[in-house]
Amino acid sequence: MPPTDRDATVSALRAFFVNPPAGTVAVYLFGSVARAESAPRSDVDVAILFDQDPPRTLEGLHLGLADELQRTLGRRVDLISLNHAPADLVHRVLHDGILVCERSRSARIRFEVRLRNEYFDLEPIRKMYRRTAAQGAATH
């Protein structure tokens, strides 16, 4: 079976993150490339979990790391910190994403359990919101 874009990207990311930045707990590939639905011009979505809450801007690390990843992969990279991402985005990363590397299995699992609990705790509110929005749209 020939390697897919997903396989090649995962391999390149694993090689890139052999020595991840300090404080990295885990790295995930998510989005269209992880789902094997990417187009030639699709960007590569990468999520990083840090052991401590990084600054919201991540300017220095984020820009430098994104630039290095773009050079390595030869395509645009969208890099996010899971520490600041909304629960629904984290859920999508965990549900559809591919774990590329982890430095601390126990810290990764604690984070995943906590975020999944938050996500499912809010699910009734999301359902009610969607139902109300659909009813409002149906009356207009």
Predicted feature residues:
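Catalytic core of pol beta-like nucleotidyltransferases
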Residues: 1-26, 34-40, 51-140
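Short, aliphatic-rich beta-strand segments
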Residues: 45-48
